[in-house]
Amino acid sequence: MKITTGQFNDSYFPIMDGVGMTAHNYARWLNEKYGKSMIVAPKGNDYEDHVPYKVYRFKSVLLPGMNPYRVGLPLIDIKFKKKIKKVGFDLVHAHCPFISGQLALNISKKLDIPFVTTFHTKYRDDFKKVINNDLIVDFLVNFTLDFYKAADLVLVPNKATGLTLEEYGFKGPYEIMPNGSDMIVPEKLKLISFRKKGLKMIDAGTDEFVMLFVGQHRWEKNIRLIIDSLRQLKLKGKSFKMVFVGEGYAAGDMKKLVRKYELQDNVVFLGVMTDRNELQKVYAASDLFVFPSVYDNSPLVIQEAAAFGVPSIVVRNSSSAESILDGVNGFLIENETADLTKKLMALMQNQHAIKIAGEGARKSIYHPWESIIDDVYYRYTELIKFHKPSK
């Protein structure tokens, strides 16, 4: 059964965040295996799309204080409205509850088709960052809950994310649909080649201890914890290289902090990397993936690192830690600078422990998107077959 589906999200290329990558991989694999799937998202400046599926873009403006994110303006984009009206969707899937999500909901009502949404993000944290009023924050959280209540199917990427949704007050049913990875586990010779090229990219020696962070450069990601720990490592005379990949509003202040701590020789900022082939080389060159975020729900980057046998360090009891067993397929720390520093110092002296955890991560954490999409397609077709037209 071939189906036509739309993936709606407020972030998409050239923004390289986890939710945008999820929407991309849904569209990519559904389009390749099960019919037609397309992305509906805001325009990104003069960015040109080069993907194997259709992309429908609508006008947008930069979101103040949240660079590189944008606010979509589909209602005033006449050309976009004409184009999207001609698409015969069988089902629409929203990956956020805001502009593009509301657009998907409206389309589902007009066409009388199933509406699916995934709860990806801790929206209350986002609201609190820009709004210093608990009443308004509660109002916005309730607004998002109404959105999820309107869906025929609500998905979450893991158990912890579902619990967050319940904490917000959602009482309806939801299903776990895990995220996957578009990275391919490289063969041994390929991995060696990637590593050699990656070390050259970051100007690191073959025996240098390399740590990596990939993600939006936002303080919510707990990046300050990383930089503070790096300072402690430097004061203790440790040799290392820390690589940051990504962009975001905090990037400038992160660089200032690195200079303040005199870490310029130890830290590399590569910026956003849209070329996934180049990013593979950076993963391959790394010993550890350091991701202490307590904001993220089910970060794709941990799976990406696992594909290259690189274990992650995450905060104990965070959503990111749900699939990690300490020392088995990753490492757990308390949300403290001292504990991260202690763990890093111990692992610098124990490459065997890193290797064991890296192999465990590759076997238990990494899952290719292609297999995930088979399950997505099954649920989509069930919804389409048993959808009851509204009266």
Question: What is each PLM-predicted segment?
Answer:
Residues 294:
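Aromatic "clamp/platform" in nucleotide-sugar-dependent glycosyltransferases that forms part
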Residues 326-327, 331-337, 346-351:
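Conserved acidic donor-binding segment of nucleotide-sugar-dependent glycosyltransferases
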Residues 147-148, 272, 280-286:
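Short alpha-helical donor nucleotide-sugar binding micro-motif in glycosyltransferases
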Residues 255-273:
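Nucleotide-activated donor-binding/catalytic signature segment of Leloir-type glycosyltransferases, i.e.
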